[in-house]
């Protein structure tokens, strides 16, 4: 599992990617959001869901058509996310502290 700064991430970010960043109430000190595909028939195609803490499982935002990478209906544009994160996703985020993991796997810490 490898984390990359969003500011240095290549152009496409596919569903299943996880974003980790420092946060505060209503989240914990660090929160993770996963890029998830919406079910068929939904108005939008993808969005972000909280995967950690007491807000885990809650939907954060559906992403607009302009968020997608050109010609890639199930991948987001990293540059769109960088340009729109504070307006569309989480206003209180330092963009230089957002990490992205595209090969997220279960924790190896379970006994």
PLM feature spans:
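Mixed-charge, Lys/Arg-rich low-complexity intrinsically disordered regions
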Residues: 1-14
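Short beta-strand element of the conserved SAM-dependent methyltransferase core
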Residues: 19, 35, 47-48, 58-60
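Short beta-strand-centered aromatic/proline hotspots
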Residues: 27-41
């Amino acid at each position: 599992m490898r984390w990359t700064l969003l500011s240095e991430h290549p152009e496409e970010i596919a569903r299943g990617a996880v974003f980790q960043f420092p946060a505060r109430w209503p989240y914990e000190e660090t929160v993770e959001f996963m890029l998830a595909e919406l079910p068929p028939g939904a108005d939008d195609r993808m969005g972000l869901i909280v995967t950690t803490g007491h807000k885990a499982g809650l939907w954060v935002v559906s992403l607009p058509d302009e968020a997608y990478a050109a010609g890639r209906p199930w991948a987001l544009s990293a540059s769109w996310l960088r340009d729109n994160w504070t307006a569309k996703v989480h206003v209180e985020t330092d963009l230089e502290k957002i990490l992205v993991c595209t090969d997220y796997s279960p924790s190896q810490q379970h006994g």
